[in-house]
Design a protein with these regions (language model features):
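Helix-to-loop junctions at the C-terminal end of transmembrane segments
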Residues: 62-76, 158-160
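Cytoplasmic helix-loop-helix junction between adjacent transmembrane helices
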Residues: 107-144
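Helix-loop junctions at membrane interfaces in 12-TM secondary transporters
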Residues: 14, 96-108
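Juxtamembrane intracellular "pre-TM" segments in multi-pass secondary transporters
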Residues: 2-12, 185-202
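Helix-loop boundary and gating motifs at the non-cytosolic
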Residues: 5-57
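Symmetry-related core transmembrane helices of the 12-TM Major Facilitator Superfamily/SLC fold
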Residues: 151, 166-184
């Protein structure tokens, strides 16, 4: 006779997840708008800015499958998600203090590698937790889209009022806020791996 799973109480899973998505897409929206302007203010020319912006896109092709595979092997999501988010915020502090093309590119590479798994891990976390609670993904994810639009509107105002060389600090602040929200997420139980998965290291 199997034991019935205990019912999940109202643990505020969806609102906390919505807060994470809002923070993530505020971060993404502001970064997309303000980061190239800051790079220009730091003295990088158009070619150098192009390299700095393009490099993370290539690195994500490697970092995303590696990061998500490691998380899958652990069977847990909260820990890897929080760790990568906190490392991403710390990496952006390195970017803020970097000076010159080489130093900035090196710091951006670090951020790209540690940040790539954040969204795939959060989506896996969301789908697992929402399904267990009989909730839909769309309404929660909607807050990310709303936040992205708001970030672009706020970013436009920021560009007109803040010196370009100081734009990095609001960007860093949004990365830090995103990382903090991962610590507020409801902890999900780890998914146990089957004996076959353990024996094959998958």
């Amino acid at each position: 006779m199997t034991r019935a799973e205990p019912p999940i109480v109202n643990d505020r899973f969806a609102p906390r997840l919505a807060l994470f998505y809002a923070a993530f897409f505020v971060m993404s929206g502001l970064h997309m708008m303000a980061f190239p302007v800051w790079l220009s203010a730091k003295g990088l020319d158009v070619a150098a800015i192009g390299i700095v912006l393009a490099t993370p896109q290539f690195l994500r092709l490697i970092a995303i499958p590696v990061g998500t595979r490691l998380a899958d092997r652990r069977g847990a999501l909260n820990g890897p998600l929080a760790a990568t988010a906190l490392a991403t915020a710390a990496g952006m502090v390195l970017v803020a203090f970097a000076d010159g093309f080489t130093a900035i590119l090196a710091a951006v590479v670090i951020v790209a590698l540690v940040s790539a798994p954040v969204l795939p891990l959060s989506d896996a976390y969301a789908l697992k937790g929402l399904a267990a609670r009989g909730l839909s993904y769309g309404p929660v994810r909607l807050w990310g889209s709303v936040a992205f639009i708001a970030a672009n509107l706020a970013g436009g105002l920021m560009l007109s009022t803040l010196a370009p060389v100081h734009l990095i600090w609001p960007i860093v602040a949004t990365y830090a806020a995103m990382a903090v929200t991962t610590l507020m997420l409801v902890r999900l139980p780890a998914t146990p791996r089957t004996p076959t998965e353990r024996s094959h290291g998958h």
